[in-house]
Every structure is written in structure tokens, then in C-alpha cells.
Amino acid sequence: MLRVLPRALRLPCSWRFSGARDCASHATTRTPEIQVQALTGPNQGITEILMNRPNARNALGNVFVSELLEALAQLREDQQVRVLLFRSAVKGVFCAGADLKEREQMSDVEVGTFVQRLRGLMSEIAAFPVPTIAAMDGFALGGGLELALACDLRIAASSAVMGLIETTRGLLPGAGGTQRLPRCLGVALAKELIFTGRRLNGAQARELGLVNHAVAQNEEGNAAYHRALALAQEILPQAPIAVRLGKVAIDRGMEVDIASGMAIEQMCYAQNIPTQDRLEGMAAFREKRAPKFVGK
């Protein structure tokens, strides 16, 4: 089941969630490349971003990037979003990376500008205030893997193929890959993977720690999505403010020395002390019941 965002937070008509009324007659008939679904019922709080550019295997083109940036800008203001899950509506592919056909038509200046914009997109994903999960049910190459690396958690089908393959195309990772991969795997291994342009399957990626979980693919081709959804369901019952602050403490702490990181943790902890959710958690423990967190 899906819910519709409050009017102030709705996406443009062509991005309305499934089940919403048809857009006004002036709306474009073009299928949006980014679709947003907010789940309801027991999954309320989980919002999905579906990448849907089948003719280009979800390649990162201008329209794709623009729609994704706009979706993120609106969703980050929606307090009902507790987990953001990235998945593909195209079977067999997560995101094939840069749209090289589109890029061939750009001047050198335009290429530089677009890559800078792409880098900004990945930074927006990384800075999203709630946990983000990439469900990788197929190819995640180049910029596609950089998108997944910008997420907090990654789930892959064992048969999924991923890699920063830019050096095989005369390029280098330009949307955060040279920075996030070594932070994920360590410098030496990241260099090896980038220098060689090596591709990994989901099982290999799990062995290296590149993904959190690898699962056998199913006939529908969405096994990683189902595992990612199960992980999101584990996050949902937890105190949302504490989860957000935990993400801030980890992300900012990883950028500094441990003493500074401890100071960041202290500041985050101090922000959580006066919350209703902390008091509810203490009361629930004392009364031996499940807590009911409200995000306040």
C-alpha cells in the first residue's frame, strides 16, 4: 500500500505515487525516470525511490539526475520518512552508470559541469537525514556503484555485477568513488579495484565488505529488494531521532580524529536527552513493554 504526501511535499504530477489521481490534463505524458513510493500499513515510514529508465538501463542522464535531485529535496523535508530505499524498476539492472551516449554530445566544459552536478547528487544521498538502503538486483557499474556507495547500507543479489569500471573507458570515478570506496574497503583494496576496473558479483562483494548482505536471486529478479525491505522493517521500530543522530555521529566522526569524533558523539547524545522518545524508551524498559516512539 502507498500513501500520498501532504500537499506541500508532493512531487510534480508526473511523479505522483501509484494509486493517486491522474494528473491534470496539462501534465506531460512522459514516463518519469524517478518514481517515489511511500509505503503504508506495517511498512509506513519506508519510502522507495524507483529508478525507471529501461531504455538506458537506468543510466545517469540529465533528466534522471534532475528528477532524483528534486525527489531528494522534497523527501528530506518529510518527517514521515524514516528509511529511504533505492531500487530499480528495470529487471536485471540497478544502475548502469553514466549515460555515455548523452555525454558524447557534451563539450568539455559541459562534461565538467555535469560531473560536478553528479558528484553533488551523491553527496545529497550521503547526507540524507535518515538511513538509506541500496537494493542491487542487477548491474551497478561506475556511477551506479557510486550511487550505492553513497547509501548507508547495500544489499545485493549474489548474481549482481558491480564495479568502478571507469578506467576501462578512459575515465576515472568522478562521483565520489575514489573517496567512498577506500573508506568502505580500505585504501589498498580500493586502489586495486579502481586500477583494474574489476567487476565483482554480489557474493564476492559481500566477502570484501562492499555490501552488507548478498542473497540468492529469485525468479522475479527482486531478491535484494525483499532483503532490503526486511532490513528497513528492522529499522522502523527504533527511535527515529536516535537513529538520525546516530547517523550524524558516525558520518561526521569518520571524517575526523577519534577525539573529535567523541566530541561529535557527545553533542549528538546531548540533543537526544530531552526527547520524548528517550523517556518513552526508559519507561518501556521499566514497564517491560515494547516502546512506542513518535519521533519527538
UniProtKB/Swiss-Prot annotation:
This is Enoyl-CoA hydratase domain-containing protein 2, mitochondrial. The keyword Lyase applies. GO terms for biological process: fatty acid metabolic process. PROSITE patterns: ENOYL_COA_HYDRATASE (PS00166). Keywords: Acetylation, Fatty acid metabolism, Lipid metabolism, Lyase, Mitochondrion, Transit peptide. It is found in: Mitochondrion. InterPro entries: ClpP/crotonase-like_dom_sf, Enoyl-CoA_hyd/isom_CS, Enoyl-CoA_hydra/iso, Enoyl-CoA_hydra_C. One of its GO terms (molecular function) is lyase activity. Signal peptide: none annotated. The record marks E146, E166 as: Important for catalytic activity. GO terms for cellular component: mitochondrion. Belongs to the enoyl-CoA hydratase/isomerase family. Residues 1-17 form a transit peptide. It holds the Pfam family ECH_1. The keyword Transmembrane does not apply. The modification N6-succinyllysine is found at K101. The modification N6-acetyllysine is found at K101.
